[in-house]
Curated annotation (Swiss-Prot):
Cell compartments where the protein resides: Endoplasmic reticulum membrane
Highest taxon above the source species: Eukaryota
Main location: endoplasmic reticulum
Protein name: Dolichyl-diphosphooligosaccharide--protein glycosyltransferase subunit 1
Listed GO CC annotations: endoplasmic reticulum membrane
Pathway in which this enzyme or protein is active: Protein modification; protein glycosylation
């Protein structure tokens, strides 16, 4: 589930659109 975190720009290419990307999940 943390695969998208390794991506430089997960917001552009989110592996988990259901979560809304790691920015929504972490909030960063």
């Amino acid at each position: 589930v943390f695969t998208h975190v390794l991506q430089p720009y997960p917001e552009i290419r989110p592996r988990f659109p259901l979560v809304g990307g790691w920015k929504t999940h972490y909030x960063v």
